[in-house]
């Protein structure tokens, strides 16, 4: 079986829950040909990516899929691209709030996800859930993590992707119930 390292962030911005990690925890241990290795990561610039890289060095995954919260979205959205910028409107969980800084000095402006984002979005929709491709992972820790991982695994066989999920109903609107978010992630993984 192939190995999928799937991550979810801890709560940030004053929240007490993060639907990304909560949904990851609900996923089965295997989906299709993948064994899932689940990892909670901190919402901290640089540290989130290094936490993923450390785990990847231990387990040697075939695919890394990070899951993050995007409270303003009404769909589960595989990300098409990571961009080489850190620019935070709020501080991360250790108080860092970089503005207009490159993630990798002199690195490419953007790096495309190496997972099949269209097939993943289509699989989510086919499961009867809201799914769409996103063309921006923002400029907060989610994008920082996506870009760092894409840069690190360039020219390797490890595929890297990111999916943003909506708030839970108790967090605000738009939202998606936790069970539906987990079902959407399972559908996306089935399209890898």
Segments (PLM) and residue ranges:
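Active-site-adjacent mobile loop/cap segments within catalytic or ligand-binding domains
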Residues: 144-190
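Catalytic beta-strand/loop cores that center a nucleophilic Ser/Cys/Thr
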Residues: 141
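N-terminal catalytic or cofactor-binding beta/alpha core of small enzyme domains
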Residues: 1-137, 151-155, 175-180, 189-192
């Amino acid at each position: 079986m192939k190995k999928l390292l799937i991550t979810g962030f801890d709560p940030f911005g004053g929240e007490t829950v993060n639907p990304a990690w909560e949904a990851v925890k609900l996923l089965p241990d295997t989906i299709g040909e993948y064994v899932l290795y689940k990892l909670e990561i901190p919402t901290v610039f640089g540290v989130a990516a290094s936490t993923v890289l450390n785990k990847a060095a231990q387990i040697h995954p075939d695919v890394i899929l990070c899951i993050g919260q995007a409270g303003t979205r009404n769909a589960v959205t595989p990300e098409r691209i990571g961009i080489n910028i850190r620019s935070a409107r709020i501080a991360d969980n250790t108080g860092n709030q970089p503005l207009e800084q490159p993630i990798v000095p002199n690195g490419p402006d953007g790096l495309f996800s190496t997972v099949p984002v269209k097939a993943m979005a289509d699989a989510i929709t086919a499961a009867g859930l809201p799914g769409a491709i996103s063309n921006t992972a923002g400029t907060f820790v989610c994008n920082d993590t996506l870009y760092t991982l894409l840069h690190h695994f360039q020219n390797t066989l490890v595929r890297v992707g990111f999916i943003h999920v909506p708030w839970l109903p108790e967090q605000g609107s738009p939202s998606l119930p936790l069970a539906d978010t987990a079902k959407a992630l399972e559908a996306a993984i089935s399209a890898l």
